[in-house]
Amino acid sequence: MHAELPIFDVENFTVVRVNELRLRLVNRFYSSCNYNVKCGRLDQVYSLSYGGEIIAAARLVSQKSGHLLLRNLCVAPAMRNQGVATQLVGKLLNALAFAEIPVNCYCYALPHLKNFYVSLGFKHLLPEHVPEDIAEIHFRNCARKRGWILMGFIII
C-alpha cells in the first residue's frame, strides 16, 4: 500500500487528493480541457483549485512494481504558463519523497516538456533502468510512435 499524500495549502492554491465521490468533477475538468480521461477508483487523483474551481489535475497510477506513474497532468488553458503545474507536481513529488513508504514516480513526457520535468527533479531514463512494468508501457508507446520520453523521479 502506498502512502497517501496530505492536503496542502499553497498561498491561494489548494492541492487535494480527490475522493472517489468527486472523481466525476475531475473527469469533467479533463473533458473541459479536451482530454479524454476517465479517472479510475484506484487512481490517486489530485487537483489544484483556485477560488473553488479546479484549475489543474494529475493522476498517480500504481503499477505492479509498486511504483507510481504520473499521468494526465493538465492545467486549464487560461492558467497555463503561470507555474500552476509546477506547484501541483512539485507538492506531489515532495510528499512522495517524505512518505512513510517512499516509491519512485515515472512519467512519459512529451519532448517539449522534457525540461519542465527535469526542473522538477525527473531524469531521462533508459528502459533497461526501470521496472519491467514501466518499460513495457514505454515499449508500447514507442511502437505507437508517440515520441514520449521515459522519465523518472527516483527516490529509492
Predicted regions and their residues:
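Conserved beta-strand in the GNAT
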Residues: S47, E53-V61, G66-C74
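Acidic/histidine-enriched, beta-strand-rich ligand/metal-binding domains
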Residues: R71, R80, F116-S119
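Conserved GNAT acetyl-CoA-binding A-motif
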Residues: L96-P111
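Conserved active-site alpha-helix within GNAT-family acetyltransferase domains
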Residues: P111-A143
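Short amphipathic alpha-helix that is part of the acyltransferase structural core
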Residues: M1-G40, S47-Y50, W148-L150, I154-I156
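Conserved acetyl-CoA-binding loop-helix of GNAT-fold acetyltransferases
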Residues: V75, N81-L96
